[in-house]
Regions:
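Transmembrane alpha-helical segments
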Residues: 116-126, 144, 167-179
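Membrane-proximal stem/loop segments at transmembrane-domain junctions that anchor or position
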Residues: 1-88
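Transmembrane-helix signature of polytopic, lipid-linked glycan biosynthesis machinery
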Residues: 125-126, 142-157
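Membrane-interface junctions at the ends of membrane-embedded or membrane-associated helices
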Residues: 126-135, 171-205
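Membrane-interface anchor segments at the N-terminal boundary of transmembrane helices
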Residues: 60-139
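Short coil/turn helix-boundary motifs
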Residues: 52-53, 129-131, 155
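Hydrophobic/aromatic-rich transmembrane helices and adjacent perimembrane loops
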Residues: 109-113, 156-176
Length: 205
């Protein structure tokens, strides 16, 4: 998977490219020989990256973006390419190839940009509020490890969907800090709204 993750593919840099299967077949289905060939490929690829810095930056930049900034995380595609026992109705066709799918992709994209910003802000608030402990930094550390792993090994946007979900608690903490922060004054504004008597209380008075 490391050999595959460091090479080009038809989909995006570092995605599935069949290298591991080819090495296994060329080695006569000998796992040890295929593994040795994979390490030879990896060393050769690392040397190439070292001699071509601009290419390396372009390769890994595209690999990161193709995995983490694909808003549907292949959730629609993975269903579309499967065989369907029943004929698709207008909803299914609209989701796969029509305006319904486009709408959800726009919605997911907006949601993910907000989540990424809020997650980064959440980490910032954890440090400035001195709330860093094993409970609060565990999920960010898991995500950091996942980022490093998928940076090097075979990539795919659906692989990182699990880690997107793990961003939500830290992002939620950011919203909590913003809503209750002294700079936004949102909490103060909401408090004043609660002090305004409603119509029923006025009639009783």
């Amino acid at each position: 998977y490391l050999d595959a993750g460091l090479n080009e593919s038809a989909m995006a840099p570092g995605w599935y490219n069949g290298i591991a299967l080819d090495d296994y077949k060329n080695a006569g289905l000998d796992a040890k020989a295929a593994n040795a060939q994979a390490w030879t490929n990896i060393k050769s690829r690392m040397n190439y990256f070292g001699k071509n810095t601009n290419y390396m930056i372009d390769f890994f930049s595209k690999k990161i973006i193709s995995q983490w900034n694909e808003p549907t995380y292949e959730s629609i595609w993975v269903s579309k390419v499967k065989s369907h026992t029943n004929e698709l109705n207008w909803i299914g066709n609209g989701m796969y190839d029509g305006s319904i799918g486009q709408f959800f992709e726009l919605y997911f994209n907006f949601y993910m940009q907000i989540l990424f910003i809020a997650f980064a802000a959440g980490i910032y608030f954890l440090f400035i509020n001195r709330k860093t402990n094993i409970e609060t930094v565990l999920l960010p550390l898991v995500i950091l490890g996942a980022f490093g792993y998928h940076l090097l090994f075979e990539g795919k946007s659906q692989y990182v969907l699990t880690y997107i979900i793990l961003m939500i608690p830290t992002a939620s903490f950011a919203f909590e800090c913003i809503l209750n922060g002294k700079y936004t004054k949102i909490k103060e504004f909401v408090g004043k709204l609660k002090e305004i008597p409603d119509g029923k209380e006025s009639e009783k008075a």
